[in-house]
Amino acid sequence: MSDLFDKFQPIIDLREGLLAAGGEDPFSLVMEKVLSPTQAICNGRETILLGTYNYMGMTFDPDVIAAGKQALDDFGAGTTGSRVLNGTYSGHRAVEQALKDFFGMDHAMVFSTGYQANLGIIYTIAGKGDYIVLDIDSHASIWDGCKMGDAEVVPFKHNDIEAMDKRLGRIPEGAGKLVILEGVYSMLGDIAPLKEMI
């Protein structure tokens, strides 16, 4: 009888081999203190954070910290349920209204993480009989959102406008199409030619 976890043995063996050969365990890095949006004390040493998601440097902004403390005082440490179950917090409505107005849209919706946004939106919008045309180097969360739904996924070569147009041209007339691009590709750091692609 096979154990459910047997399939992980090759990965375990590889990791143990790397460690035995003097490789460093990537999970041994401990961040003891964050000093700034780009620096922390890791394993006792000051370290530059090259993989941070702190894109706008707001984690140490005094106004953001004060608002976070106030939100904890007003609402506690969590919503204790979904919007459908418990309702929507006034702060969520306020930020969605501000985003809607700023971008000149009919509606805006916030998610806790970008990953959740991609999961929640993509498979909801594109379903059976629809097509998702996306850059091959899109973030894993985008791919996961595509996998959750029933739409046909059609990838194209990274940042290649001609390849994208060719894929779009092959989609049946009348089918729903969702084109997914990233403004800045988080995995590569390069920028999509959005003006030309839209």
Regions found by a protein language model. Give the residues of each.
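Short, compositionally biased leader-like segments
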Residues: 1-19
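N-terminal "arm"/small-domain region of PLP-dependent enzymes with the aminotransferase-like
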Residues: 13-75
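Short, small-residue-enriched loops and turns at beta-alpha junctions
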Residues: 57-58, 85-88, 140, 161-162, ...
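Conserved N-terminal alpha-helix of the aminotransferase class I/II PLP-enzyme fold
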Residues: 66, 71-113
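Short, structured coil segments at secondary-structure junctions
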Residues: 128, 148-150
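Active-site phosphate-binding strand-loop segment of PLP-dependent enzymes
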Residues: 154, 158-198
